[in-house]
């Protein structure tokens, strides 16, 4: 699928020739004895709609009758009748199928009935796709179905609501065949397309939800859910602009649960900026309290929640053990964030995580692997030297801590400059005046 506004499908030949070509393709599904009659019927309809130009004689002695003018209404009726005969993908090589459908797109675009005809075409192209993909009923035609729908999508106007219908049909096909990689570039462009398409906000939200569900289903099989989560959040932001409903609450709970399940996601504060998530608080949804714990709570808070809301874990398909492990890692990261460029004793870590002393190093290794902390273990000193640590949220306390560290660095620099000046008899080294000004600023 192309991100371009419009890809024009060119069709050669007269209207009659185009109709005959498509009808000949469709006649393959007819009994052999009636195929010629089928083609002749549509050829006559095409001639009635757009009479052929009379051939010029070699020597003209008298004026010839001019051809009748094309009848737009009859042309449209002919195309409508032709499209009504398309009930399945059809028979032919992939190249032939793609070419014929491009011609059909061209014929449809010449009418003002795209809104009625395109859905018929989508149904025909998608019909029996699952059976074909599994080898039942003939060769697998999945790839050519994808290309046909992609070509149709690209032939439609950038703002056309039919693009959404075409995208949904293609999404259903690739999801059924576990071929979502085919839509990688399309999913990247989807937010931009949604802004262009002339469809309602509800339809946009429904599209995002369909994408998220398709990705969830596919990624569960492969142990990945990060891309699905991105679309869950995008969907949630869309429906946050709509009137609240039971489905909004359900979507918010599903999104928060998906975030908590992600094994390498540790930052949850952004979810608290989504209105649908904030509405969970007024709806007294326990998962909002759980989210708040992972944003700024402790292992003790989590244990208290788990003891009073044990049924929530099963309802939301959450693993208590996985979440306990995650909140402990966050607790350890918080502890380390208070001691950047300093040592954290094994005893402090054991107390914070409520673990045995001999388990400390394993937890430190885990938090480093999670990307939350970097540092160096010292078995000699029974301490962990912290180089850097991430914060779950950056609020007033974190700003105050940063200010204190900057003041400490400022004082250290001033002290170093004064020491150098003293050893030089009061003369500052080159560049020191600037440093001194910074130190006293």
Swiss-Prot record:
Organism of derivation: Mycosarcoma maydis (Corn smut fungus)
Name of the protein in its database record: Eukaryotic translation initiation factor 3 subunit M
Locations listed in the record: Cytoplasm
Record field: compositional bias (Low complexity): 55-67
InterPro entries: COPS7/eIF3m, eIF3m, eIF3m_C_helix, PCI_dom
Domain spans labelled PCI: 227-391
Region of interest (Disordered), ranges: 50-75
GO cellular component assignments: eukaryotic 43S preinitiation complex; eukaryotic 48S preinitiation complex; eukaryotic translation initiation factor 3 complex; eukaryotic translation initiation factor 3 complex, eIF3m
Alphabetical keyword list: Cytoplasm, Initiation factor, Protein biosynthesis
Protein function: Component of the eukaryotic translation initiation factor 3 (eIF-3) complex, which is involved in protein synthesis of a specialized repertoire of mRNAs and, together with other initiation factors, stimulates binding of mRNA and methionyl-tRNAi to the 40S ribosome. The eIF-3 complex specifically targets and initiates translation of a subset of mRNAs involved in cell proliferation.
Assembly: Component of the eukaryotic translation initiation factor 3 (eIF-3) complex.
GO-annotated molecular function: translation initiation factor activity
One record GO biological process: cytoplasmic translational initiation
Principal cellular location given in the protein's record: cytoplasm
Domain of life of the native organism: Eukaryota
Protein family (similarity comment): Belongs to the eIF-3 subunit M family.
